[in-house]
Amino acid sequence: MQKFYTLICTLVLLLSMTFMAPVSALAADYTPVVTENEISVFLETSYDNAKIWAWNDKVKQFTTAEWPGDAMTLMGTKDGKNVFKWTYTAGTEIPTGVIFSHDGGQKLNGGNQEFKNHGYYVE
């Protein structure tokens, strides 16, 4: 009887490891979070790196780095894609234009796009 019990326990353990591990490994999709007064945008992309270039009529460059701009921060994933965030902290002016890029300046979504504060852009 003890051998039978040990066999059943071993089978249950193996089955749970086989079928439950992949389910528990799935992380919940990232949900964007912003603070009230922040200037920020999100980008959902299949690439593992993203940069941003932002400007308006008065300010030629909102980024601290030269082209292709600032590296965006990886926040999590959604539907298997990476979600990046960029936050502007150097002032209260808001950009009107934005370009997202990857791998040394390859433009995403055709290049120039309208900047929307707290906007969520998808590649």
Question: What is each residue range found by the language model?
Answer:
Residues 93-98:
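Exposed beta-strand face motif in extracellular beta-rich ectodomains
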Residues 46-92, 105-112:
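Aromatic-rich carbohydrate-binding modules that target alpha-glucans
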Residues 1-9:
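Bacterial N-terminal signal peptides that target proteins for export
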Residues 11, 37, 48, 80-82, ...:
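Beta-strand-connecting loop/turn residues
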Residues 30-32, 113-123:
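Extracellular beta-sheet/turn segments enriched in Thr/Pro/Gly and aliphatic residues
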Residues 17-32:
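Sec-dependent signal peptide cleavage junction
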